[in-house]
């Protein structure tokens, strides 16, 4: 599996980036994770089709090429960061590349709740008609007190959180396979479906 792992912040130092970097190493035998930084994207504005920034087009292409997307979000004032909202607005307004794309949400925060409100906010956004991502149900990875969650080598310290992450990622790989199969079968059915006017003799 090939996943695009989006760092949902423009902060230079981020435990959400550390979380994705850890996942990239830890799950390398199961999947390839490409980290993507949204900090270089321009703030969203309504652009004409021929004026969409190249950075946005590049992000859309990477999303399309990936089997699924992982988004790591911090929590600012009970919500996702403005820079992540802006990136999603670009996708919604232009390519809609997240439509039917399997998505896993994870998050780290300095507080005890581990970005739970931001993750709920992000789910609501990704479920909007213009994005319409395929969100893995009943799954949250909440890494609270994240400043103390990693050792100097960037390894996750808490064995219980590591086991939880292992289980969630295993389920996400299976979820990705299921969605890919479902969409493939739906495409075949659409191709094979004939309407009355198509079968009517001339």
UniProtKB/Swiss-Prot annotation:
Its cofactor is FMN. Disulfide bonds: none annotated. It comes from Vibrio ruber (strain DSM 16370 / JCM 11486 / BCRC 17186 / CECT 7878 / LMG 23124 / VR1). NADH:(hydroxy)cinnamate reductase Crd is a heterodimer composed of CrdA and CrdB subunits, encoded by adjacent genes. One of its GO terms (cellular component) is cytosol. InterPro entries: Flavoprotein-like_sf (IPR029039), FMN_Rdtase-like_dom (IPR005025), NAD(P)H-dep_reductase (IPR050712). Pfam families: FMN_red. Binds 1 FMN non-covalently per subunit. CrdA is formed by a single NADH:flavin domain, which is homologous to the analogous N-terminal domain of CrdB (51% identity, 65% similarity). Belongs to the NADH-dependent flavin reductase family. It comes from the Bacteria. The gene is crdA. One of its GO terms (molecular function) is FMN binding. Component of the NADH:(hydroxy)cinnamate reductase. CrdA is probably reduced by NADH and then transfers the electrons to the catalytic center of CrdB. Is likely involved in protecting V.ruber from (hydroxy)cinnamate poisoning. This is NADH:(hydroxy)cinnamate reductase subunit CrdA.
